[in-house]
Design a protein with these regions (language model features):
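A metal-dependent, Asp-based hydrolase signature
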Residues: 48-80, 90, 97-98
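Structural signature of beta-strand start/N-cap positions in the alpha/beta core
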Residues: 4, 102-105, 161, 181, ...
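Structural recognition of alpha->loop->beta junctions
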Residues: 125-132, 194-211
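Substrate-recognition/cap helix-loop segment adjacent to the acidic, metal-dependent catalytic center
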Residues: 30-32, 36, 53-62, 85, ...
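Acidic, Mg2+-coordinating phosphoryl-transfer loop and its flanking beta/alpha structural elements
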Residues: 163-204
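Short alpha-helical
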Residues: 20, 49, 94, 115-116, ...
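Active-site neighborhood of HAD-like aspartate-dependent phosphohydrolases
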Residues: 1-44, 55
């Protein structure tokens, strides 16, 4: 095998989380009398953490203190509703089982709240993901490479033996900043041009295609 570890993004890569994210965003917005956002708007807002998601979702020129209150409502609601509509993409479970059977270590590095990320990974992929790192105090979020370095240290794997898999420009830049290759996936929240423009080393159309590069 070329690599000893595969590090995955979560939203748009392993799981389709848009509906649960949209529902929690709209619940939070409704508590402040703000208009709802549609699925495509949420799709374009995700990738840079929940604070950025909420700040883009509230109306323009919303005072920061109101945005922060809306964020708190979102966090509480999403922590309790993160697995209602969310589901793994077809073929992901088969890929993770194949990696495990071949002794490849796996991890998730995501800008999602750490508690929600752990809940989703445990609910859908219990025993198939070795390490999960979401938003944690003291660990800079993507595209900074801190989360990648953290999981490599926990897994005991060097950068030369790891690859990152994601669906967005944030993932491509994260991999580049960490000094590891990036496999871009076509079933997520961004299109092929975004992945190419941001330097994905490989682009795949199906989850099992990832194994060909491992």
């Amino acid at each position: 095998m070329k690599y000893d570890a595969v590090i995955f993004d979560l939203d748009g890569t392993l799981t389709d989380t848009l509906e649960d994210l949209k529902n929690s965003v709209n619940y939070a917005l409704s508590q402040f009398g703000f208009p709802e956002r549609n699925t495509e708007e949420i799709r374009s807002f995700v990738g840079n953490g929940v604070k950025r998601l909420i700040y883009l979702s509230v109306p323009e020129n919303t005072p920061d203190e109101i945005s922060e209150s809306c964020l708190s409502v979102f966090r509480e609601h999403y922590n309790n509703h993160s697995c209602e509509k969310t589901k793994p993409y077809d073929g992901i479970a088969d890929l993770l089982k194949l990696l495990k059977d071949n002794g490849i270590k796996t991890a998730v590095v995501t800008n999602k709240m750490h508690s929600a990320a752990e809940d989703i990974v445990k609910y859908f992929f219990d025993g198939l993901i070795d390490v999960t790192v979401g938003q944690i105090d003291g660990v800079a979020q993507k595209p900074q490479p801190d989360g990648v370095y953290r999981v490599l240290d926990l897994l005991g794997v060097s950068r030369e033996k790891a690859v990152y898999v994601g669906d967005s420009e944030v993932d491509c830049i994260t991999a580049k900043n960490a000094g590891i290759p990036c496999i871009g996936v076509m079933w997520g929240f961004r299109d092929r041009d975004v992945l190419i423009k941001n330097g994905a080393d490989y682009i795949v159309d199906r989850p099992l295609d990832i194994f060909d590069y491992i």
